[in-house]
UniProtKB/Swiss-Prot annotation:
InterPro entries: Glycosyl_transferase_4 (IPR000715), PNAcMuramoyl-5peptid_Trfase (IPR003524), PNAcMuramoyl-5peptid_Trfase_CS (IPR018480). Belongs to the glycosyltransferase 4 family. MraY subfamily. Pathway: Cell wall biogenesis; peptidoglycan biosynthesis. This is Phospho-N-acetylmuramoyl-pentapeptide-transferase. The gene is mraY. It is an enzyme of class 2 (transferase). GO terms for biological process: cell division; cell wall organization; peptidoglycan biosynthetic process; regulation of cell shape. The chain crosses the membrane at residues 3-23, 54-74, 84-104, 114-134, 156-176, 187-207, 231-251, 255-275, 283-303, 330-350. Keywords: Cell cycle, Cell division, Cell membrane, Cell shape, Cell wall biogenesis/degradation, Magnesium, Membrane, Metal-binding, Peptidoglycan synthesis, Transferase, Transmembrane, Transmembrane helix. GO terms for molecular function: metal ion binding; phospho-N-acetylmuramoyl-pentapeptide-transferase activity; UDP-N-acetylmuramoyl-L-alanyl-D-glutamyl-meso-2,6-diaminopimelyl-D-alanyl-D-alanine:undecaprenyl-phosphate transferase activity. It catalyses: UDP-N-acetyl-alpha-D-muramoyl-L-alanyl-gamma-D-glutamyl-meso-2,6-diaminopimeloyl-D-alanyl-D-alanine + di-trans,octa-cis-undecaprenyl phosphate = di-trans,octa-cis-undecaprenyl diphospho-N-acetyl-alpha-D-muramoyl-L-alanyl-D-glutamyl-meso-2,6-diaminopimeloyl-D-alanyl-D-alanine + UMP.
Length: 358
């Protein structure tokens, strides 16, 4: 428990102090956000706001995680684990893809960076490498960071995948979550605030899995998850890093996370869902991100079939803006939706445990 608090404290401190330094540096370098020309007119005033703030989130997460382990040496805590390093590595790899995308946008002075094919190639490469490595590193309890079963709150043993199908599934999960968070990052503080609520829920889930781990408590309802406590450190560091960044990203934003941050955070969710054996539960807890992505898919599908638009603009947070909701109203209400989804998901998680223990 102490390490979780240390991870959060360090990540929060690094993120909240590093972000203003990045604001000054990026502003000096002219690294400003380009705004989509077909977006809400009110967003044009945001043109030139420093972007790529996701760098602060990533550095904050790594600092919190590694710093908590350095402190843990004092009381003989276990060192970094394969599961946590793989999840952080996936987030960092996708953050690198986002950084390249952001940099191209800035250099070309337009809201178009990497081509769709180039972005998907980067996402798929990161996903496949993660998937391959996640089936390695068998721990003392015989568990690998990932399993080839589909999972809800724990593995669904009746649904097993071969290696190729598993890698395809991991690729789908990674691409879907990274793009979902990317689409949500369209209003000041929306993605960072929503992400802190989702990751906060996962701090509880991973700590519960640690407390009821089959490796230490082989009892009814225990969890077969490799390194749950270390994954809790990642979740705590991620939550705190997002909150620290949100201090400067809240409306009116002084900096945007850019694709650097949104792709990284989406990768973090994907990696956590796989390593904690909660792939289907993550859809519930991260329902806001799912809804944002679904709104884009529905908008395209309806337009192609009927030539009419389902929403005034997609992702659907823009629909509410164009319906005369103030930007801050949309943001706060969406945060509330994210909080409700996280709470509902935690309720499902706990109810499954109660059912398992009889």
């Amino acid at each position: 428990m102490r390490q979780i608090l240390f991870a959060a404290a360090i990540a929060l401190t690094v993120s909240i102090l590093l972000t203003p330094a990045l604001i000054k540096f990026f502003a000096k370098q002219g690294f400003g956000q380009e705004i989509r020309v077909d977006g809400p007119a009110s967003h044009q005033s945001k043109r030139g706001t420093p972007t790529m703030g996701g760098v602060a989130i990533l550095i904050g997460m790594w600092a919190g995680y590694l710093g908590s382990h350095l402190i843990g040496i004092a009381y003989d805590a276990e060192g970094p684990s394969a599961s946590a390093l793989l999840v952080l590595g996936l987030a960092t790899a996708l953050g690198a893809v986002g950084f390249i995308d952001d940099f191209i946008k800035i250099r070309k002075g337009r809201n178009l960076g990497l081509t769709a094919a180039g972005k998907y190639l980067g996402q798929l490469t990161a996903a496949i490498v993660f998937g391959v490595l996640a089936l390695q590193f068998r721990g003392e309890n015989g568990l690998t960071p990932a399993s080839r079963h589909l999972s809800y709150v724990r593995d669904i043993t009746t649904v097993s995948m071969g290696v190729i199908v598993f890698l395809a599934f991991v690729s789908l999960v990674v691409v879907a979550w990274s793009n979902a968070v990317n689409l949500t990052d369209g209003l000041d503080g929306l993605a960072a605030g929503s992400m802190s609520l989702v990751l906060g829920g996962y701090v509880i889930i991973t700590f519960w899995q640690y407390y009821h781990a089959c490796a230490t408590k082989p009892e009814t309802g225990c969890y077969n998850v490799r390194d749950p406590l270390d994954l809790a450190l990642v979740c705590a560091a991620g939550t705190a890093a997002c909150i620290g960044f949100l201090w400067w990203n809240a409306a009116p934003a002084k900096i945007f996370m850019g694709d650097t941050g949104s792709l990284a955070l989406g990768g973090l969710l994907a990696g956590l869902s796989i390593t904690t054996r909660t792939e289907l539960l993550m859809v519930v807890i991260g329902a806001l991100f799912v809804a944002e992505a679904a709104s884009v898919v529905l908008q395209v599908a309806v337009f192609r079939t009927t030539r009419n638009r389902l929403f005034k603009m997609a992702p659907f947070h823009h629909h509410f803006e164009l319906s005369k909701w103030a930007e801050t109203t949309v943001i706060i209400r969406f945060w509330l939706l994210a909080a409700m989804a996280s709470a509902f998901g935690l309720g499902l998680f706990y109810s499954e445990y109660l059912s398992a223990v009889g």
